[in-house]
Amino acid sequence: LMRSSAASDVYKRQSVLDAITLRDAGRNATQIKQVLEEQKLDSSIYITLETLKYLKKGGRITPAAAAIGTVLNLKPVLQIQGEKLDAYSKTRGKKQAKRVMLKAMQNDLENRFAEYVKRGEMCLQSAYTGNQEEAEEFKKEIAEVFPGIEIVQNPLSLSVACHIGHGAIAVACSRKVVVE
């Protein structure tokens, strides 16, 4: 649930824009679906949580790990690359988590997606649960690291928020469809 919901929340807008681009280029529904499915793996999300409570409730971490993590102010950084959700890093505090996410995204854009970046085919997204003020601040931090790249920001859906809790923030990139 988390993988498909979180990723689809973040990329929904771009997928619609890509489908419109393909439709306007004369592609039929089957062709549009095929292109969107092929390109969905050309994406990356990094997300950090405010609390470990919901990971504990969902059985993703033990109560003991949640208690220790809370006392130490640990903030996990999770990643979704293509179809897979994984732990990326454990950080002390949200500030460090944001730095780790931005550095990871920079690495993805400079290495994994370098050819798409050169061709102007990558776009950035920011997402959050609940705290719009913090999300706006994080969007500014993203813009400082990636000047000149449009960043679209949207809240994550309630179906995702109930699994990760209030105060989560994410940075993501995805490949835009380019019709030749």
Name each model feature, range by range:
Residues 9-180:
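Mixed-charge interfacial surface used for oligomerization/domain docking
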